[in-house]
A protein has these predicted regions:
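Post-transcriptional modification and biogenesis factors for structured RNAs
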Residues: 1-160
Length: 160
């Protein structure tokens, strides 16, 4: 099972969309405060639709609190500043995927401390970044692809 870690997310709709991705994929969602919204806000709930009961959500006061409560064996930090592509990463079951706040990304000192675990999603140079919920989905599905989509249904059934 993958772990999505949102460090100080600011936009409730992004959190709701990410929760829905977690519900569909079985990922755990970890939220690092401060949050830019109340988790019970209507916008968060609406974006997650009626999937919230399928999501394991954990919240923490800060990154120190998070690391004190979790045994992180593998982690990847997503950042536009990273030197390598997420496609070069080898994701393991149980890994933690860290994403920063929408306006600033992950803290610079955190990136420096985990330099070898920093990856980016390639994009055009003129674009600053992708939407947070899109970046999470792209990374999660690459990790799941590498793990052969554990616990997921790969094929649908047409009615006719």
């Amino acid at each position: 099972m993958l772990n999505i870690v949102l460090v100080e997310p600011e936009i409730p709709q992004n959190c709701g969309n990410i929760a829905r991705t977690c519900a569909a994929t079985g990922c755990r969602l970890h939220l690092i405060r401060p949050l830019g919204f109340d988790i019970s806000e209507k916008a968060v709930r609406r974006a997650g639709l009626d999937y919230w009961h399928l999501v394991e959500v954990f919240d923490y006061d800060n990154l120190d609190d998070f690391f004190a409560k979790n045994d992180v064996k593998q982690m990847w930090c997503l950042s536009t500043k990273a030197p390598q592509s997420y496609a070069e990463a080898r994701f393991e079951d149980g890994c933690y995927l860290f994403f920063g706040k929408e306006t600033k990304g992950l803290p610079e000192d955190f990136l420096e401390a985990h330099r070898d675990q920093c990856v980016k999603i390639p994009m055009r140079e003129a674009a600053r970044s992708l939407n947070l919920s899109n970046a999470v989905a792209i990374t999660v599905f690459e990790a799941l692809r590498q793990l052969d989509f554990p616990g997921l249904t790969e094929y649908g059934k047409m009615k006719k």
